[in-house]
């Protein structure tokens, strides 16, 4: 938002506000994934604003149980209502409608995503952290498998233990998405293995280093070093 002012005195190795919103607002992120052919869960978008969609009329093209989560985590942070959770796991239409109504009654005015459940426990989750240089080329990737996730209502999805792994197919998919939009800097993806057929679904991208980024350092690459080498020392980061 204040990039034009700040970059007069600081080096800012981050993307602009427009692209940030396009990637971090999950409904827009899924639309972008569809454009470039990156696989995501089947999703229905519900307008949770006060004069938005009617919870009673929502129909789904996939069976229960389903997952519901806010499109904008930043805006949802300020919403307060009984039973609030970071992610909702809903067994039937009654639970879905009650949840949609509860969210809609709060101060949250954004979209809510209703998604098919991708089966699998914590170990089905994958973490990918990438670094794209100032020209938008992905120069580094660190991939891991989640071993244990946070179970607290507002911490669901946060990995507590990660094991380093390798998967060039997923890295290639992520790089194709990032390079299509001219992304620069660090990106952190949440991805899940679909146990039914061995395919993967991209859940979201954080336009920053994740809270789990220290797993990169344990794997041999201090993530801060990449920014220092390119932006302060003028070096080229080779993949």
What are these regions (language model features)?
Residues 238-239:
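A glycine-rich beta-turn/hairpin centered on an aromatic-Pro dipeptide
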Residues 115-116, 184-196:
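A short glycine-rich, hydrophobically flanked beta-strand micro-motif that places a catalytic Asp/Glu
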Residues 1-24, 37-42:
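A short, GP-enriched loop/loop-strand-helix hinge that lies immediately N-terminal to
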């Amino acid at each position: 938002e204040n990039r034009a002012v700040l970059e007069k005195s600081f080096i800012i190795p981050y993307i602009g506000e427009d692209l940030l919103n396009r990637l971090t607002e999950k409904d827009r992120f899924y639309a972008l994934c569809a454009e470039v052919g990156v696989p995501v869960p089947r999703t229905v978008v519900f307008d949770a604003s006060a004069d938005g969609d009617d919870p009673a009329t929502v129909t789904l093209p996939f069976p229960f149980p389903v997952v519901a989560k806010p499109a904008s985590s930043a805006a949802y942070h300020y919403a307060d209502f009984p039973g609030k959770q970071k992610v909702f796991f809903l067994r039937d239409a009654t639970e879905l409608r009650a949840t949609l109504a509860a969210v809609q009654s709060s101060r949250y005015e954004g979209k809510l995503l209703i998604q098919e459940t991708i089966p699998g426990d914590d170990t089905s989750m994958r973490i990918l952290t990438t670094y794209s240089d100032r020209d938008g080329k992905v120069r580094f990737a660190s991939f891991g498998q989640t071993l244990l996730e946070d179970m607290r209502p507002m911490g669901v999805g946060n990995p507590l233990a990660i094991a380093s792994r390798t998967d060039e197919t997923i890295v290639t998919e992520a790089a194709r998405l990032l390079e299509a939009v001219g992304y620069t800097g660090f990106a952190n993806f949440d991805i899940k293995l679909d146990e039914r057929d061995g395919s993967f679904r991209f859940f979201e991208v954080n336009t920053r280093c994740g809270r789990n980024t220290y797993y990169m350092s344990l794997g041999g690459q201090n993530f801060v070093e990449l920014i220092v080498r390119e932006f302060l020392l003028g070096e080229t980061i080779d993949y």
